[in-house]
Structure formats: structure tokens, C-alpha cells
Amino acid sequence: MNHRGKAQIMLIKFDIYHDGDWWCARGMGVDIFTQGKTLDELMKNINDAVELHFEENIEAGEEITVVSLTEFQVGSVAKISGC
């Protein structure tokens, strides 16, 4: 916490992409990389990787909250007749 008693928020952005059979996440601005077979597994692995990366900070009493915002680019969708 900072000197005013408010927890500091650390925002870590991840580049998430699909590579073969794996969903991959690369931290932007931090050396974190993880992967999972599903998006749910990837999100769990991101949380685990962040905890490991910032282990010393957590042991020193800092609170780190992972907030995920996922954005996907979708290709063109076929037009459905009648719509």
C-alpha cells in the first residue's frame, strides 16, 4: 500500500494469440510468457505466472490484482440468409 493506505494497481497488458493447439500470452513490458490448451487454462496460467514473477513483491506485503481484458479480432462472418 502507498503512504495514504490505498493499494496501488499494477496493470499488465498481455498479447494473447492462438498458435497451433495452444493459446499463448506474452506480457507487454514484463518478461512473462505462458500458454494453455483452452482460454480458461490460459487465464489460470496467467495468474500463476504473474504471482511467480512478482513473488518478492507479494512476500513484501504488496497486493497485486490481475484484471484481464480480452480483445479478439474476428474475421469476416458469412452472411446468414434471412438476416
Question: PLM features: residue spans?
Answer:
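Short aromatic-glycine-(Arg/Gly/Cys) micro-motifs in beta-strand/loop hairpins
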Residues: 15-27
